[in-house]
């Protein structure tokens, strides 16, 4: 499948890279408003669904907000990629007409969805910071039974006391990784893939229950941090040939940078 790279932001290139990396269990996208997190996830999961025929579950804490938020992102993303004719958009489900795979949408207020997530290859947690820590622990334990299953989380800046900071980030060690993406054997130019940071957690020593030997597990989590400066539909593409320069949006962010740096 060929996708025009001019349809994607830097977040999208990293998502395509790590959605195809079976050593990565958790893909975390972190950044403020207008950084293109949710839309990039929608784009790349649609692409992956066409390519691998696997099912995805998209969740928010409360289901009532889904249709007007992340579900709409998927519809707009499919149209933007020129692939909407390859999907059937139903209430709470998007079905791929090419291979029968589904993208289901649900709130955590539907407890039955948590019990039956083992048949999904991917689970997306939109607005991750709205979920409680016990919610996340249940989800990560129940997503099992298939090789390469992944949880993709998007969230905005949080307080130092939030459980994501205390229980997920602070309990691991992190290191920066090169901001490089190779597609079809060709490394993309740096200006197309530059974000604020890309970090992975440290390898872990894990007991193999079959061999009773301690083995090293490769890093299983990647955190991609971006800002509005990495959204080509806010600041325009590096070469000026695609995307959109939103003068009013940029002016608003610049005002905050000068007058309200803590909020910025």
Language model feature labels by segment:
Residues 1-264:
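Phosphate/NTP-binding elements of NTP-utilizing enzymes
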